[in-house]
Every structure is written in C-alpha cells, then in structure tokens.
C-alpha cells in the first residue's frame, strides 16, 4: 500500500475517533445535571412573611389535621417504652425480648418511609395519609389485644410501617400547601406540638394503665389512644391535594402551572446532589448514624431500669421519663424563625 493510502486511512481513523468522542461528550452533556447558584433558588431573596399569613394562604385545615395526627402518633409511640415491664410480665418473656420489639418498632417506622414515599410521588397524598392512619389505629388496637410476644412483634411491624407516612407524606403535603417563606416556622410548630405530645405521652399512657389497673392495664393505653387516630384518619381523607411545587413555580415563573399538565420527572441524582451540598444535612446524617444505635435501645431500657431499681409502677415511670423530651421544645421556635431568615439569604 502506498504512503498516500496509509495517510488517508490514518486520517479517516482520526476523524472517526474525533466524531465518536464528540458524540459521547454531547451525550454526557445532555445527561449532566445542572445545579443553579443559590441566589437563583426559589424563595431566596423573597420578602418576610408572618406564619399566620402563610398558613392562611394554604388553609389551616391541612396543617391542623396533619399536626393532630402526628401528635397522637407520638402519644401511642411511647407506650411500649413506658409499659415494657408490664408487657414482659404479661407474656412471661425477658426484658431483652420487649427491648428487641421496641427497637424493631423504630426500624419498621424507618423501613416504611421508602414505599410510602414512592406512593406519594405517584398518587394523591390525602388518601395515603388517611389509609395509613386508619391502619395505624387498627394495628394499635391489635397491639393491645396481642396474646403473645410473637403477635405483639407483628402488630408493631404493621403500626411502624403505617406510621411512616408522617415522615414522607406529611412533609411533602405541608411543603406543597404552604409558602416557602414560612416553612421553617411551620415545620417547627408542627414538630413542636407533636413533640409536646410525645413529652407528655409517658404520663398519659402510664395514667391510662394505672387507671385500668391490674397486670394487663397496659392494654387499655393502646385501646384508648387508637380512638382519636381513627377519627382523625377520616378527616385526613378530606385534605385537598395541592399542586406539586406550586410555590416554587410561582416564585420562579410568577405563576403556578396547570395542575392537569403532566408532571416533569424529577432526577433523583440531581436532588441528592443539591441536598448533599447543604452542610447541615451532611453533619446531621453522620451524627444520626453514629448516635442512633445507642439512643434507640436506651429508650426501651429506661423503664426496666426504673421498675427494677426503684419499683416504679407505670404512672410513676411516666412522670420520671416525661422530662427527657422537653429540652428540644425550648429551642424549636427560635430554630424555625432562624431557618426562614437564613434561607432567604444563604440557603446553603
């Protein structure tokens, strides 16, 4: 083959490789997620808004129902920790068995967040909240009616999965219903009221068990506390479905879009890329991973310690454990207000 032929072949090969490299670069560019600067994010630089005004814009109904549901969920959630010694004696099982079931209940709560979040992205959310809350009430009743530790385990499994709607479904409903400028204070108020119920729950569940009397008085705590959750579940079905991302669209475009339009799919990678840039999220995730395994068993063991060392009954254990949940409540109002102020200027 002549030198000219070899040169033409080499030139053709180089051209093909260059075209292929350009094609791959174009494909990569098309798939590359764009992360906008902070000052272009929805809500940044907006005017300050009073919490009451923000709640009025979205309607008080959604906030009231979801906050009440979260509060009663917290009330029931403390029962197994406070009443653990009585439950163990009823079923004739060890402290370790009830501690395991208590810790597993927390794991079930986290486990249910994924499936319910998947549903919340694809369906109307009010029916999910109503159905999950109703199931939570049913499993709470069945927990009180448990005949052995094996049944108790599976009833807590069902209760934990259904309660998980408060993690993923509640938060998205609130975010889409109320303006960006009040979300910090709104979530602080929502969480504060729920945590207040959680702080008082040891006293309440202990009082119900003490009032019912007897070795199996603990069952009545589950029976009684399931009633308001069941009632609120029916109110949850009436929660109006807000347009997804309506306040973000309004802030960026000046108006929300037609809710009947097909939703643009969200890139999970882009969402995580944006969220993981927030220092608070990174630090909190690492801290929870480090502390979680130590904190969860501690809540279940406290009641056994108080009963064995000091002979406290259910009501007395409730009074002893209640103060441990009050510290957070002192700071939530300030944290919520500070968040709203900071987000408008430095969201990262």
Report the location of each language-model feature:
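Conserved MFS/SLC helix-loop-helix module at the cytosolic interface between two early adjacent transmembrane helices
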Residues: 111-150
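Cytoplasmic helix-loop-helix junction between adjacent transmembrane helices
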Residues: 155-194
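Helix-breaking motifs and short loop linkers at transmembrane-helix boundaries and internal kinks
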Residues: 92, 124, 145-151, 162, ...
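Extracytoplasmic
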Residues: 61-95, 298-303
């Amino acid at each position: 083959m002549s030198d000219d032929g070899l040169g033409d072949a080499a030139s053709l090969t180089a051209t093909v490789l260059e075209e292929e490299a350009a094609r791959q670069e174009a494909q990569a560019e098309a798939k590359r997620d764009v992360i906008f600067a902070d000052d272009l994010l929805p809500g940044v630089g907006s005017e300050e808004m009073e919490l009451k005004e923000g709640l009025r814009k979205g309607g008080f109904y959604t906030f009231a129902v979801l906050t009440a549901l979260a509060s009663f969920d917290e009330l029931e959630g403390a029962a197994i920790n406070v009443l653990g010694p009585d439950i163990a004696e009823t079923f004739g099982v060890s402290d370790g068995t009830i501690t395991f079931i208590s810790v597993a209940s927390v794991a079930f709560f986290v486990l249910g967040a994924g499936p319910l979040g998947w549903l919340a992205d694809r369906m109307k959310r009010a029916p999910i909240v109503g159905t999950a809350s109703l199931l939570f009430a049913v499993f709470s009743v069945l927990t009180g009616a448990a005949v052995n530790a094996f049944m108790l385990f599976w009833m807590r499994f069902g209760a934990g999965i259904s309660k998980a709607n408060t993690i993923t479904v509640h938060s998205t409903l609130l975010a889409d219903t109320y303006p960006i400028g009040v979300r910090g204070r709104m979530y602080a108020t929502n969480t504060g009221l729920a945590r207040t119920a959680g702080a008082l729950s040891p006293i309440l569940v202990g009082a119900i068990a003490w009032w019912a009397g007897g070795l199996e008085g603990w069952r009545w705590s589950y029976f009684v506390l399931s009633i308001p959750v069941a009632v609120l579940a029916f109110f949850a079905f009436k929660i109006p479905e807000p347009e997804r991302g309506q306040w973000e669209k309004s802030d960026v475009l000046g108006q929300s879009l037609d809710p009947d339009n097909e939703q643009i799919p969200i890139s999970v990678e882009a969402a995580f890329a944006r969220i993981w840039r927030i220092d608070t999220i990174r630090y909190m995730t690492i801290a929870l991973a480090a502390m979680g395994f130590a904190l969860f068993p501690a809540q279940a063991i406290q009641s056994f310690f108080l009963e064995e060392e000091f002979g406290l009954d259910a009501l007395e254990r409730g009074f002893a454990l209640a103060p441990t949940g009050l510290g957070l409540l002192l700071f939530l109002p300030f944290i919520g207000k500070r968040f709203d102020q900071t987000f408008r200027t430095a969201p990262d």
